[in-house]
Amino acid sequence: MKIKTLAIVVLSALSLSSTAALADTTPTTVNGGTVHFKGEVVNAACAVDAGSVDQTVQLGQVRTATLKQAGATSSAVGFNIQLNDCDTTVATKAAVAFLGTAIDSTHPKVLALQSSAAGSATNVGVQILDRTGNELTLDGATFSAETTLNNGTNTIPFQARYFATGAATPGAANADATFKVQYQ
């Protein structure tokens, strides 16, 4: 009896495994998504590093007490624009210009903050300073101090800081600027 039961169990298991082996093994293909490839081929002395093209500078949290009156600034935070594959037989100097919306006509060197659904800070914007500490006009035509290029990789340092146009109120304090590089 035990042998008969064992034989039935073994035969049942074998029939199940053969059924699974005969199951449909046709592969299934589904749409996955889109991959975007972005870049640019340039005829210039250098190529802007991909990490510099679309970067975020973290200015962090700053107390309203630090920005309580017009002209007050936060501590500056450094950031860089890296140039790769530079060829000094093409150009020996580089400078950068930033373009963004100024907070108002009396402050052309202060970026306006973006609107935020959660509420934006007021009476404050963002300044960009070049390696010499000069505040840059955000018109896309006023360039930073020139940097002498070396063959290969070059780094152009900048700083950003909050600038109060009055007593700052709390809220999100984000701003955007684009940049372009001029080679000479």
From Swiss-Prot:
The UniProt record lists the keyword Signal: yes
Pfam families assigned: Fimbrial
GO cellular component: pilus
Signal peptide annotation: 1-23
Compartment list: Fimbrium
Disulfide bonds: C46-C86
Example of a GO biological process term: cell adhesion involved in single-species biofilm formation
Keyword hit for tRNA-binding: no
Task performed by this protein: Fimbriae (also called pili), polar filaments radiating from the surface of the bacterium to a length of 0.5-1.5 micrometers and numbering 100-300 per cell, enable bacteria to colonize the epithelium of specific host organs.
Additional facts recorded: The fimA gene is highly variable between different strains of E.coli.
Name listed for the protein in its UniProt record: Type-1 fimbrial protein, A chain
Origin organism lineage: Bacteria, Pseudomonadati, Pseudomonadota, Gammaproteobacteria, Enterobacterales
